[in-house]
Amino acid sequence: MDLEKYKKSYQEIEAFQQTKNLDYYAHPARYYVKPFKIVGNVYYIGDSKVCSHLIDTGDGLIMFDSGFQHSVHLLVQAVWEAGFNPADIKYLIHSHEHFDHIGAADEFRDLYGCKLVISRAGADVMRERPELVYLKACPSPYATLFTPDL
């Protein structure tokens, strides 16, 4: 793909992301999903737009994907409602680097002290090609990329 086609494609994706979820951005609580046990010690704590999961290791919690920054309060509520304390989250592992999966990473680290984890490829994209995270399409003007701990 040549650079001009890439730029046009990126702009189209960004514009689509900015408009497709306007109601979710304005009213995230409408998309709340009551947390539930999937199997054994694995729980669904996401909403109807972004999947997030929690694993109880017995020695602390591992969370997968932090979702959007603007809906962090829903994830915190879901952790409590699932019967856990967010302060027990030891690791927050991100499946990939798109803003709808990493948006609240820094909030969880700042509030609860958990370690932020992403693949080396994801960390490289955030550092070297941040435009691919689609951060400009994020509803929060304060959203930022995080620096992984591991």
Residue ranges and their predicted role:
Residues Y10, Q17-K20, K49-C51, H70, ...:
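Residue-level detector of flexible, active-site-proximal loop/helix-junction positions
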Residues L22, M63-F64, I93-H94:
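A generic structural signal for short
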Residues N21-Y24, A29-Y32, V39-V42, I102, ...:
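Intrinsically disordered, low-complexity segments enriched in polar/charged residues with Gly/Pro
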Residues P28-A82, P86:
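Conserved beta-strand hairpin/beta-sheet module of binuclear metal-dependent hydrolase folds
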Residues M1-P28:
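Accessory terminal helices/loops
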Residues Q18, D59-L61, K90:
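A short, structure-level motif marking secondary-structure boundaries and short turns
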Residues V42, H70-H73, W80-L150:
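Active-site HxH/HxHxD metal-binding segment of metal-dependent hydrolases
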Residues M1-Y6, V33-V39, H96:
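Short N-terminal helix-initiation segments at or just after the protein's N-terminus
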